Design a protein with these regions (language model features):
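Tandem repeat scaffolds
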Residues: 1-145
Length: 145
C-alpha cells in the first residue's frame, strides 16, 4: 500500500492508473485526466475532486468522507458501499450512479443531481426527508376527499 497524504495533483495524467490499498487523505486533484482509473480499497477522506470527471469509474466501497465533490461528474459510477458522509456535493453529477448501501448525508441528497440513480428503500426515505417530504399514512381528513 502507498500513501499520498495532502498531495497536490495538478493537470496530472492519471488515466490508466491503478491505486490499490492507497491513502490519498487530504490530497487535491485539479484538472487531472482521470479516466479510466482504478481505485480499490482506498481512503479518499478529505480529498478534493472538485470538477473532476470520474464518469463510469468504480468507486464502490471507497472512503470519501468529507470529500470535496463540488461539480464533479460521477455519472454512471458504482458507489455501492462507499462512505460519502460529510461530502460537499453542490452540483455533483450522480446521474445513473449506483448508490445502494452507501452512506450519504442530507446535504448530498439536496445538492447532487440524481436522475436515474439507484438507491435502497432506506436511502429513498432519507432523500424524501432531506427534501422536506412527510412520509406516512396519517391524513387529517381520514383519507376521504
Amino acid at each position: 500500500s502507498s500513501a499520498f497524504v495532502s498531495c497536490t495533483f495538478e493537470r496530472a495524467a492519471l488515466h490508466g492508473a491503478s491505486f490499490e490499498g492507497c491513502r490519498l487523505t487530504g490530497s487535491t486533484f485539479t484538472e487531472c485526466r482521470t479516466r479510466p482509473l482504478t481505485l480499490r480499497d482506498c481512503d479518499l477522506t478529505l480529498v478534493s475532486l472538485a470538477g473532476a470527471n470520474l464518469a463510469g469509474v468504480d468507486l464502490s466501497g471507497l472512503r470519501l468522507r468529507e470529500a470535496n465533490l463540488v461539480r464533479a461528474d460521477l455519472t454512471g459510477c458504482d458507489l455501492r458501499g462507499a462512505d460519502l458522509s460529510g461530502a460537499r456535493a453542490e452540483r455533483l453529477m450522480l446521474i445513473d450512479a449506483d448508490l445502494r448501501g452507501s452512506r450519504i448525508d442530507a446535504a448530498l441528497w439536496m445538492g447532487a443531481v440524481l436522475s436515474g440513480a439507484r438507491v435502497d428503500i432506506d436511502q429513498a426515505v432519507l432523500f424524501a426527508a432531506a427534501h422536506g417530504l412527510s412520509i406516512g399514512g396519517d391524513d387529517a381528513d381520514g383519507g376521504e376527499g
